[in-house]
Amino acid sequence: MNQELSTNPFNPVAPVKTFDEIKISLASPERILSWSYGEIKKPETINYRTFKPERDGLFCARIFGPIKDYECLCGKYKRMKYRGVVCEKCGVEVTLQKVRRERMGHIELAAPVAHIWFLKSLPSRIGLMLDMTLRDLERILYFENYVVIEPGLTDLTYGQLMTEEEFLDAQDQYGADAFTANIGAEAIREMLSAIDLEQTAETLREELKEATGELKPKKIIKRLKIVESFLESGNRPEWMILTVLPVIPPELRPLVPLDGGRFATSDLNDLYRRVINRNNRLKRLIELRAPDIIVRNEKRMLQEAVDALFDNGRRGRVITGTNKRPLKSLSDMLKGKQGRFRQNLLGKRVDFSGRSVIVTGPELKLHQCGLPKKMALELFKPFIYSRLEAKGLSSTVKQAKKLVEKERPEVWDILDEVIREHPVLLNRAPTLHRLGIQAFEPILIEGKAIQLHPLVCSAFNADFDGDQMAVHVPLSLEAQLEARVLMMSTNNVLSPANGAPIIVPSQDMVLGLYYTTMERRGMKGEGMAFSSVEEVEHALAAGEVHLHATITARIKQIDEEGNEVVKRYQTTPGRLRLGNLLPLNAKAPFELVNRLLRKKDVQNVIDTVYRYCGQKESVIFCDQIMGMGFREAFKAGISFGKDDMLIPDTKWPIVNEVRDQVKEFEQQYMDGLITQGEKYNKVVDAWSKCSDKVAGEMMAEISAVRYDDAGAEKEPNSVYMMSHSGARGSPAQMKQLGGMRGLMAKPNGEIIETPIISNFKEGLTVLEYFNSTHGARKGLADTALKTANSGYLTRRLVDVAQDCIVRTHDCGTENAITASAAVNEGEVVSPLAERVLGRVAAEDILVPGSDEVIVARGELIDERRADLVDQANVASVRIRSPLTCEAEEGVCAMCYGRDLARGTLVNIGEAVGIIAAQSIGEPGTQLTMRTFHIGGIAQGGQQSFLEASQEGRIEFRNPNLLENANGEQIVMGRNMQLAIIDEAGQERATHKLTYGAKVHVKDGQTVKRATRLFEWDPYTLPIIAEKAGVARFVDLVSGISVREDTDEATGMTQKIVSDWRSTPKGGDLKPEIIIMNPETGDPMRNEAGNPISYPMSVEAILSVEDGQTVRAGDVVARIPREGARTKDITGGLPRVAELFEARRPKDHAIIAENDGYVRFGKDYKNKRRITIEPVDDTLNSVEYMVPKGKHIPVQEGDFVQKGDYIMDGNPAPHDILRILGVEALANYMIDEVQEVYRLQGVKINDKHIEVIVRQMLQKYEILDSGETTLLKGEHVDKAELDEVNQKAMDHGMRPAHAEPILLGITKASLQTRSFISAASFQETTRVLTEASVQGKRDKLVGLKENVIVGRLIPAGTGGATSRVKKIAHDRDQKVIDTRRAEAESAAALAAPTDEVIDLGSEDSGLVETVENREE
């Protein structure tokens, strides 16, 4: 807990100052003077001839201390024995030169000056205190207007502004003494010091009770907050105006002589000099009684000089130095990436480090790295010196140095000793996740490059094309221990992001293993039988059997009981070799490798070995298969030439067929049968299908099995082997080499209609080449942007989650979330077993339909239990989650579940927040940057139908169907679902049916897999007539609300609803189509008895004419999907950022807040009013305003359920939280984020997203303050809220009422309780201004604060030590308290009086000296 500030140089044995928290507040003039060692009167710095500091200047030795250790300026006193003497000649105290880093000075200002932070940092604190606008304040401060401070008996008002003329007139009118008005900072200072804070707070509270309206209470609350914070912190408002200016120690703004008699100086000296010059001039002018106007001008200049010193450029012109460069002010020293916080406090350069290029080291073990001798010698120098001395080879450091410089042979022997079992850390920038720094044991090598083990490359994301890596030496024993136990590469087999092995073979190794495990027909030695592995090896060496021949052989295995048995397998020599490397374990049988191994399979094998055979075995196994992979790939001699790229013969027939199709589409377009947009979509569709087809043909050709004349199977195509094994190259790349390149996208994401038909083997035509430059250039630009964006996202995530640490074992909460399989478009993308793995069950999990418990409550679900859950067909499981954890600080281990990188329950002290942030941010660079627009996806066609993914029985939910004239079933409802139920009655899939879809199956029908269930129009959203009748147009006026589009190419016209609000006459129109009864001429009515009318939205295409007869199920109008677009797919990184920043989408969906019936109210000018009348009478009806012309999918009288969309679009996460609660929000966030990553094939565990969402939900917004001190609309932490409410309840007062709110990650980081952490993140000046006004205390609980003040972080081993210290401290405290109580009771007995006796009762504290075990 306790931290040394610095050792006292004068008294090293004095106890060091310790602290537990840091407080920031305003400094009063007295406080500034108490820091100061003297006033600085002159702007001079140092004498240019003698280089000695000038007296009373900015570097004055008398004020700040001596230049040399223990030596005064004139040289009269030298050496230690005069320590503490003040020289009578030059006035310098004889002491350490170091005091020049800590002694401060001050400048007495001739006129008060406003502190720019409190003036200009919005909202202006001075302005809020005085209830004045910033503009008025500046007018007073910069001497444009007078302000009335004391109106007296005149009819002026307090705080009124007057110009010079008005002021003089008023003086003439009322007399000079009748009222007080003033100008400049003095006036503001007088007003601030006159404020009675308690009185003001009272008045404001009274006003707040009576205030009505929207803005007034907000304004009052703002002022009340600041008044209260001044009251609580003990600051005075007038301290925001400076009368004394502190001067920072000279060593912190150094003046350095350069060669050639010039000086380099810190900008601060320039800024201070300007202030001193102007201040001195002002003093002189006041003494000389100069005219007012001159003095004022000088005061204004002084104010500007001080402003520039504190925050240059915040107000007025930026003050520049000699070379037109803006001067760096005090604020700039703190701000930004180059500021104090991020440059020097959060990251520092360290010694004992080096960097060099990396090369591969395939003969290393997994825990080793090759370190060049020269580097090791330099890095381990002090260790070598001490060993040399210990061995008696050198008596002094100087001698040792000489030996090392000469590189004598004994030095190398000693280096070997020193380096033995001393791990070093290797780091590759960018360190995107914790696996970017790992520990290895160094092996000395010749040469100058670091050797890296090939298996750890994927963790470092390293390759050997010139990458560099840095080496760091952990010095202390503790550091070495942590490096070995926590950071050793052998201890980091699993990835913390998803729990899968990250130490996996890649490239050559995969290819080698693939080749080894191949099986080919008709090879030499096929059908032979062998008795043991050794015999097979023998036969291979003798050339009697081929690596790929099918043979029968015996191999040792372990059965279920754990006995060694010998089993026979049909296999190949290659697979047998691999099986021989497997650790003997019942759970890792030979079947594991008795198959063709691709990259995924190899990862699976490693995972299985790690889970069941332990870490040591798996590390040895990894090393062995790496060696084998390299060896076999080398022996196989796989390589390819241009002839291995096959172009299928069927390519041109396919292409020509599609060309004809495209011609046909063009013709249809010319004839006006389809619109240009439809033509574009169809053409793009056709070409993308063609390109896929050609690729398919090519893959079929290239993967075909071929035989030689003897009937033996030939080796497969080399390119195919590389791609199929997962070593290098993807089908997409092969398609470009041997198929056709396909469609290209323009830089804005649109797709060019003409595809590139050639492939790289044939070569591109000039035109095709030109078309392809688009994509290539965009790719490069994207990559550069992506890296920066991804890094910034990671930084924000880390900042919001940095104080989320596992603090307790179990918080005992009853809350939980429900996990079920993730289904996307009716396809299970992540099964339930995968989602609950490594979580703690919140309730007993039962076999459906029985009482058999699979997993008991509070048990960790491991692989075995997850399999049981899967086999039992459980639909959903209640699991503990960080979201619902109720731990006081951080989260508890039970809610978090398994530590993915270790495979066991998470340890207390694990920094799960940072791990979550890294896991989400690290794959960021793999995500795409672009926002897709529907109508341009280079991957091809729009899906327009859905097939059954499983067999089962169809069940309709909330059916609402209509049969049209052709006998087709059309969906008319908005919340109809279609479910597929299996034999056991378990729901296997549910699909939401869109309005206007055609359903091909009946309720209760049994379907096979791939039966077409329903289809819809992917390009437009239809509006369908419910009943037969005559269509009647209302307010569809040609030229105002309808435009006729004539297609130039085809001459066809379409009637399209245009935006009628933009026309002058169209303000009140409500364009709609009504279905009339042809007999009566009245509108037809629906079941609810309302007239059937269809309001038209902008851009709708009318499909009927006025007065045309329509049948039930006919399409009245079509809305293009672009207009009522299902959603604009923001893809990739921007989507993830949008979700975590909790931004409201542009056209966000409107969600029904409760169950009820839809009513359309009276319309506004260009908004429509929708009201929901709740079923439950106790609730109020809710109104929504929807812009006219937006498509509203609900009708008058429709019943909606809580959480239904009244308007389509992306839902705003805030609404989901408010209406449906935390769990629904969690599910939404997890699904949306996972969808983005899933598209890229990145696996991230859900719990990481939950941790981040938990951090976004920390704050509560006060809805009703009750009788507490909290204010309506204020954001407070849950802990704070509970504390205040508890206090209120104890006193019998009404508690405050609040609801959780969702903050975006940037907002949440800036609102954290620690001001140090917030200031080091963003908007440094604003955070510090706010914190100092409130007198905030930083309790140093998060990681960042502790790093900044230079302590161990309170996580991991640092957390353990601080916990032990706390226990010890508490125990000591108990003993002290008991002793004190004893002493007091003894004193009380000696002098018996009535009051004191009951102190003795506290004696019971003595018993509990053994610390509480829970700590």
UniProtKB/Swiss-Prot annotation:
Source species, domain of life: Bacteria
Keyword terms of this UniProt record: DNA-directed RNA polymerase, Magnesium, Metal-binding, Nucleotidyltransferase, Transcription, Transferase, Zinc
Annotated Mg(2+) binding sites: D463, D465, D467
GO cellular component, one term: DNA-directed RNA polymerase complex
GO molecular-function term, one example from the UniProt record: zinc ion binding
SUPFAM superfamilies tied to this protein: beta and beta-prime subunits of DNA dependent RNA-polymerase
Residues bound to Zn(2+) 1: C72, C74, C87, C90
Cofactor: Mg(2+); Zn(2+)
Binding site residues for Zn(2+) 2: C811, C885, C892, C895
Reactions listed under catalytic activity: RNA(n) + a ribonucleoside 5'-triphosphate = RNA(n+1) + diphosphate
Free-text remark on how the cofactor is bound: Binds 1 Mg(2+) ion per subunit. Binds 2 Zn(2+) ions per subunit.
Matches recorded under HAMAP family: RNApol_bact_RpoC
Summary of subunit composition and partner proteins: The RNAP catalytic core consists of 2 alpha, 1 beta, 1 beta' and 1 omega subunit. When a sigma factor is associated with the core the holoenzyme is formed, which can initiate transcription.
PANTHER family xref list: DNA-DIRECTED RNA POLYMERASE, DNA-DIRECTED RNA POLYMERASE SUBUNIT BETA
Protein name: DNA-directed RNA polymerase subunit beta'
